Amino acid sequence: MTALRDYVKSFLLVELLQGLRLTGKHFLSRSVTLEYPEEKTPKSPRFRGMHALRRYPNGEERCIACKLCEAVCPALAITIEAGPREDDGTRRTTLYEIDMFKCIYCGFCEESCPVDSIVETREHEYHMEHREERVFDKARLLANGDKYEAQIAADRAADAPYR
């Protein structure tokens, strides 16, 4: 009896019609994919993208050269050298570099920073034309921080209840 039923199902193409019905149902529904460069998905305030160093409102850089971000980095992408300041003798960074080819964007550096100096912005569309550009130095990181400070502050404010 089952052999006869299987023969009738295959003769009437029941499985094919069931598959066509399912395909037709999804064919008429709204598209899930986006055309990436033209359409972009919204990003979370916790998105981890390009790194930046922040400044205080008076223009002084926040980094106190504690080297916690360098110590906690699992990819060993951060290099810091510290030295005393000329005016008040406090410790500040003389060299702050992040090798973006090594970075895995884990966010540990951001979490470990006691003064919220190193942050990751929402910017993920950046490129490098030469291999030497992969190392972001202190000047470039500070420039990123100045450029995205409004967005960084808004993201920090939105995320504050969860910290």
Swiss-Prot record:
Residues the record lists as binding [4Fe-4S] cluster 2: C73, C103, C106, C109
Presence of the UniProt keyword Magnesium in the record: no
Pfam family, one: Fer4_7
Recorded GO MF terms: 4 iron, 4 sulfur cluster binding; iron ion binding; NADH:ubiquinone reductase (non-electrogenic) activity; quinone binding
Cofactor, free-text remark: Binds 2 [4Fe-4S] clusters per subunit.
Annotated GO biological process: aerobic respiration
Subunit and partners: NDH-1 is composed of 14 different subunits. Subunits NuoA, H, J, K, L, M, N constitute the membrane sector of the complex.
Protein name per Swiss-Prot or TrEMBL: NADH-quinone oxidoreductase subunit I
